[in-house]
């Protein structure tokens, strides 16, 4: 039977009663009973009498209960103290009479019935004797509730048992399905378009809050990382550990959308939607694309480009201009020169290749460098290794990028992109050199030389090639960073490329100035110099010729101890540095090869020079790390790159103190990776004139710049008073306020420990204490045994 014949038959057969129904117009009976005037007094009085009786009964009942409780209280009072002490023991919540009480299953009613009502009464009386009053009260309450429930329960059980399970609805048979299909096939289907909601820009506080919540969720995830069946890598690197669990497809899709939307918003809008902001943790675990696979995530770079206030590269949509310059040797990373120079985002899961504007995964390091500025585009990561170093998981690439400088080529040295990734993960060196400005972890290890990406063979990054040279600092052959500091230097020069397209590095030439053994592509002065030359030109900086002064580039301070003010972050302090977001480069240990050579180090720039990452203590107190990408990156940066995995993560933000110069162990910092501070957000300042290089007097100058007429009537007690106060504080606590004077509030907040941390600390010390006690006991036993042996041997000697 087909559809039409069914319809015909239905039309032919009228319903069972063919008689048409009509409405009757007759008025029906009234719905409510008519009200009778007057009151039926007898009924009302009877009702009132009944009520009074009930009230009296209740009062009597209450009185009896109260008397019973008072009597019990008297009984209990005499040994209350003993009982209180006993009730604090762990064994049981009742009083403790020396015999551990077995917790009885809570079937008071059932067991009572079996043993006879009298016995059950006695047992409850005994229990009650040992209970404190509050317990008694709660206990009696819950017992009465339980009794009521149990009385009600049996009938319910019987009722439930009868019907059994409902039979499942009969399945549609095939013909019905066909009919249904025929009916539905021509009906239009509503396609619900997801509404795209423009997210408003968020304030720093909101961002911090969001990040905090996200981290919280991540912690929960960490407990069961095997979600959706995928193994997820946890990136040790950044303070916020992102678990990326998303399927790679969704990642691709999302990144496409992001890139579309962000590229449209030019100059300006620097949209900080959280999604952009984090460039979503990408699914790291399962997608390690091998080197050459192509991966569309354009997002981070595109986003950058749109996203920051800076104007995206001249073309407007960060295009990777350089596609072609793909470093020949390097893993296929292709630097994207997209204007967005820095993606400082956090390393996104491996899959996301930050710079990805180039569109291919950066050698696995992808993630770690996710932050590499997109400009740098390719994390040089362990280049060879093919898997993201470390951070892979970390996932959120927050693009910080000041998007590219006007020239459209990446400005920040790879922009802050410091790949914060820390995990030693695949690469031998295991850890990306972290910030190494170039943003790409220079995990030397795998590739040995992590060859500079940029200029493919030539060793000098090609102009746009942007950070083009991820070159790992290690002498290429050596496979390990040269100079202890090695890793630090991974800083790519490329970025430094000035507007003109040639590296502005002080050295001027595209190639790093004298890296010791390395090929020219390597940054100079073994990392020590932290690529001194690679001074990325700050976005804003205009003159092509000179490295942007303010730019965050790390130029090693002449002294050689890198003074690290990370420029990027101290957003507060001087967010004015244009480049600030630019790159902070951790300097790796004090530069080993002497100070960087060549013009590059500019003494004046000291503060802005490299940031030391050491154990999270940044050398320059000034960098207020908090804000942007400037965060020091993985310790690996500190020259440790060779070390396998950092042992501990320093709390969220590195705390810098001016007078602390990390001690170098044969040139390496003994660094621990410092994690990214949770709340940080790249500091954005509108593109503007480049600031003069920040010199040691920068503090004074900034104070002048920040003069605010409204603050004229602000009453300040004056420095004198503060010093007095800090003197007293020092006397009491041995605390030196001056030491933290330049610290951002943000950093200081992380110096305080939370209650939870204290608890952890206590638990840890307790554990250690127990271990020590056990060891002592063992030692004592051994000593006793030895003494016994000696006695025996002495006796034997005597007997002979």
Curated annotation (Swiss-Prot):
Query: What InterPro entries would the database entry show?
Result: Chromatin_SPT2 (IPR013256), SPT2_N (IPR054552)
Composition-biased stretches (Polar residues): 260-272, 608-626
Q: Where is this region: Important for interaction with histones?
A: 688-800
Q: Name one GO cellular component term.
A: nucleolus
- Compartment list: Nucleus, Nucleolus
Tell me the function of this protein. Histone chaperone that stabilizes pre-existing histone tetramers and regulates replication-independent histone exchange on chromatin. Required for normal chromatin refolding in the coding region of transcribed genes, and for the suppression of spurious transcription. Binds DNA and histones and promotes nucleosome assembly (in vitro). Facilitates formation of tetrameric histone complexes containing histone H3 and H4. Modulates RNA polymerase 1-mediated transcription. Binds DNA, with a preference for branched DNA species, such as Y-form DNA and Holliday junction DNA.
Domain comment, as recorded: The acidic C-terminal domain mediates interaction with histone H3/H4 complexes.
Q: Kindly provide the name given to this protein in its UniProt entry.
A: Protein SPT2 homolog
Native source organism of the sequence: Xenopus laevis (African clawed frog)
* Recorded name of the encoding gene: spty2d1
């Amino acid at each position: 039977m087909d559809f039409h014949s069914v319809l015909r038959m239905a039309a032919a057969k009228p319903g069972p009663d063919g008689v048409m129904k009509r409405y009757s117009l007759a008025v029906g009976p009234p719905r409510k009973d008519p009200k009778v005037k007057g009151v039926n007094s007898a009924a009302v009085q009877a009702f009132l009498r009944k009520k009074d009786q009930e009230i009296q009964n209740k009062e009597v009942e209450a009185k009896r209960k109260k008397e019973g409780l008072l009597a019990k209280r008297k009984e209990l009072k005499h040994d209350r103290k003993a009982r209180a002490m006993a009730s604090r023991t762990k064994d049981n919540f009742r009083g403790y009479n020396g015999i551990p009480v077995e917790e009885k299953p809570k079937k008071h009613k059932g067991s009572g019935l079996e043993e006879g009502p009298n016995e059950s009464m006695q047992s409850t009386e005994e229990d009650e004797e040992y209970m404190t009053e509050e317990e008694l009260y709660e206990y009696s309450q819950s017992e009465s509730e339980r009794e009521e429930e149990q009385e009600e329960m049996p009938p319910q059980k019987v009722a439930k048992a009868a019907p059994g399970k409902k039979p499942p609805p009969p399945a549609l048979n095939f013909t019905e399905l066909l009919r249904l299909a025929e009916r539905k096939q021509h009906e239009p289907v509503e396609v619900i378009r997801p509404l795209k909601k423009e997210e408003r820009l968020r304030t720093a506080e909101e961002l911090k809050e969001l990040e905090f919540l996200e981290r919280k969720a991540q912690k929960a995830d960490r407990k069961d990382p095997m979600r959706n069946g995928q193994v997820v890598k946890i990136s040790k690197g950044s303070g916020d550990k992102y678990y990326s669990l998303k399927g790679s497809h969704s990642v691709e899709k999302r990144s496409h959308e992001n890139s579309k939307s962000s590229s449209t918003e030019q100059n300006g809008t620097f949209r900080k939607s959280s999604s952009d902001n984090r460039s979503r943790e990408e699914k790291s675990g399962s997608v390690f694309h091998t080197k050459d696979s192509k991966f569309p995530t354009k997002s981070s770079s595109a986003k950058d480009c749109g996203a920051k206030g800076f104007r995206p590269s001249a073309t407007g949509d960060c295009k990777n201009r350089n596609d072609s310059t793909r470093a020949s040797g390097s893993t296929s990373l292709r630097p994207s020169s997209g204007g967005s120079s820095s993606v400082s985002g956090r390393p996104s899961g491996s899959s996301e290749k930050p710079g990805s504007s180039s569109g291919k995964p950066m050698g696995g390091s992808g993630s770690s460098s996710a932050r590499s500025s997109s400009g740098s585009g390719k994390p040089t990561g362990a280049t060879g290794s093919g898997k993201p170093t470390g951070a892979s998981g970390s996932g959120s690439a927050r693009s910080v990028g000041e998007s590219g400088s006007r020239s459209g080529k990446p400005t920040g040295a790879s922009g802050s992109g410091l790949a914060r990734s820390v995990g030693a993960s695949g690469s031998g060196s295991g850890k990306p050199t972290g910030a190494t400005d170039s943003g790409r972890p220079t995990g030397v290890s795998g590739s040995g030389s992590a060859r500079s990406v940029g200029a493919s063979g030539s060793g000098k990054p090609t102009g746009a090639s942007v950070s083009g040279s991820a070159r790992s600092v290690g002498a290429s052959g050596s496979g390990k960073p040269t100079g202890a500091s090695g890793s630090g230097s991974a800083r790519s020069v490329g970025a430094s490329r000035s507007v003109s397209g040639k590296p502005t590095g002080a050295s001027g030439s595209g190639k790093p100035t004298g890296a010791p053994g390395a090929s020219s592509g390597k940054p100079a002065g073994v990392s020590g110099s932290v690529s001194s030359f690679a001074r990325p030109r700050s976005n804003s900086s205009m003159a092509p010729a000179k490295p942007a002064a303010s730019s965050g580039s790390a130029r090693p301070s002449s002294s050689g101890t890198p003074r690290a003010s990370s420029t990027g972050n101290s957003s507060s302090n001087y967010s004015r540095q244009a480049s600030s977001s630019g790159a902070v480069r951790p300097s790796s240990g004090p530069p080993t090869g002497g100070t960087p050579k060549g013009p590059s180090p500019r003494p004046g720039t000291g503060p802005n020079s490299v940031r030391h990452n050491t154990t999270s203590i940044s050398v320059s107190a000034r960098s207020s790390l908090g804000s942007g990408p400037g965060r020091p990156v993985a310790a690996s940066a500190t020259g440790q790159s060779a070390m396998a995995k950092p042992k501990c993560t320093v709390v969220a933000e590195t705390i810098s103190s001016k007078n602390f110069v990390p001690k170098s162990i044969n040139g390496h910092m003994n660094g621990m990776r410092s994690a990214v501070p949770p709340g940080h957000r790249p500091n954005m300042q509108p593109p503007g004139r480049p600031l003069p290089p920040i010199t040691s007097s920068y503090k004074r100058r900034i104070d002048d710049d920040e003069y605010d007429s409204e603050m004229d009537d602000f009453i300040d007690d004056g420095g004198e008073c503060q010093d007095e106060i800090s003197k007293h504080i020092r006397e009491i606590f041995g605390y030196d306020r001056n030491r933290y004077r330049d610290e951002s509030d943000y950093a200081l907040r992380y110096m305080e420990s939370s209650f939870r941390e204290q608890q952890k600390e206590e638990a840890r010390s307790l554990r250690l204490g127990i271990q020590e006690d056990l060891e002592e006991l063992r030692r004592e036993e051994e000593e006793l045994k030895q003494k016994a042996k000696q006695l025996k041997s002495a006796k034997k000697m005597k007997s002979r």
